[in-house]
């Protein structure tokens, strides 16, 4: 891999390119996460229980698919274009097309055919997204092996999602709804815009991000023993900690996001108020981006995540018993909690890279693709559970999906209890897992990286 020797040094261009890559993924994946269930229930008039089952089944299959793709990526030798970038470049095109097809209004066809169309477009999109996201997530581990640069990449990656969520929370409710009712054609129009912008961002990532860390290639004829690697991964406490921490935290955050529109539409009585939250979230996002790395450097990634997310969990535990009916007051409280919990979202990718290093420390092999895709499996599992759970919650509380329906007082109160209760449990359990399972404190991370550098230097000197 001699071409690696002439690659330019790590720079701001890499950080911006990686930000754009995450933004590109979010343009399709997060748009779907925010509005596809709403599109299914309110536009296609599909029973929330049926939507929940569909999402659960397809997401579990998609999660199983992640380690398979990771193993395929690991088994392929690097080409002139790199090991991971060619995957992103090629599969981002069909992924964009499938994102658009998911928002085609098929509400007038037979109910069974409607479900079949939803299933096919959902499964195909997620398969293509995996072929983009697994190589993209692994890419940061070969862009640099410097700990501060990796933390910066994790921070800049989170910025991509933050930019998307900030803009979409402001634009979505204002554009997609007229007189508090969803408009089918606007969902498709926004899907087209998101798909094209996402494709553009990912193609820029392929040009601006460079692979620098030499990945040892397997000897000729030696095959990757997938089951052996999985057995080794099962002893990786760092990966186990970050997987289960992310699993529970993501379930909490995703269910809350899934109920967000219903909270503003039915509990507060005006879905457009959600746009105010989006505008204020710009300030919170800027503050989070500014403070997270200094706080992580001072206290450690694990330590700051526990403190911030723990604070947010306690606040929402109190809100469960004491509802806030003033939307402005709620938005402010929610924003303060976001600052606390944001460390978990910003630093998670740096912690995954640390888990890859921990795997190398234990086994002498990196296997970035499988390690990352195993983590991605748990993220997809969390997405499956949370995406289904928000729909199951709506079905369980008796939410009426009929166009223009007014929800009963009991349903409206249940939306609040579900929103705050899931937030408290999700983040509370996540903090406990991180504290008791994840071993890499600030000191232990520094010791691990020192040991790995010494080992690599010894290998190069032979």
Predicted features, each with a name:
Residues 2-462:
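Membrane-embedded alpha-helical bundles of multi-pass transporters/translocases
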